[in-house]
């Protein structure tokens, strides 16, 4: 019923708030018009009343909102009180403590006093594990380990046979003559041939290729010695034939035989090298005395 009343009041407050806002807007519009003095006074009075009513409505709305919040806190308090009243009894794990069923706060206080008397100077926290039964729930309180550095637990020691098996893992059966432990060990070896060990081949390093080329040996070529061919002696050409002919003509102007010989000599010299006989004949003629020309007698 209280919820319905609160909802109704909230709705009425909202409606009044809206109507008052509309009235204020209308009164402000009418006041701007040029009306008579009496009408303006009445409008101003109405505006003052509406503004005060708006303030009152806002206060009521805030109060109702605060009233809505308070029941929730009361419900929470009631729930907590019910939980405290209906808490079940707790039983401890150790019956030697002699703790009777009671509230959990009393149990924890008694346990802390006992632990403080047995282990002074060590801080310990309680780890409670709840075990649910059909009707009651029991908590098992166990003192936690001290906060000092915990040593790692060593693994449990293995039996002697396994220890020997680990040590003598590669024992061939040929060695065992009358030793029973040796025979037991050599039987446990899986299908592995005795005496052979797996050898890992060393990995070959990749050979680095050198980009530089090997210098080739320079072969010195023997320079050919220029063989000087014997220069052939130039053939004596009788190029100066005009000089000889002029000399001969001056000496043999009157002898027709000499002129014929000179003509034959001139023809042979133009064709090629003269024979030694011709050369000798040409050289002999200047040495001969020139005969005087035959002048006709009168």
Swiss-Prot record:
Belongs to the pneumoviruses glycoprotein G family. Disulfide bonds join 173-186, 176-182. The chain crosses the membrane at residues 43-63. The lineage of its organism: Viruses, Riboviria, Orthornavirae, Negarnaviricota, Haploviricotina. The gene is G. Residues 211-232 have a biased composition (Basic and acidic residues). Residues 1-42 are cytoplasmic. Residues 125-161, 190-298 are annotated as: Disordered. This is Major surface glycoprotein G. Residues 190-207 have a biased composition (Basic residues).
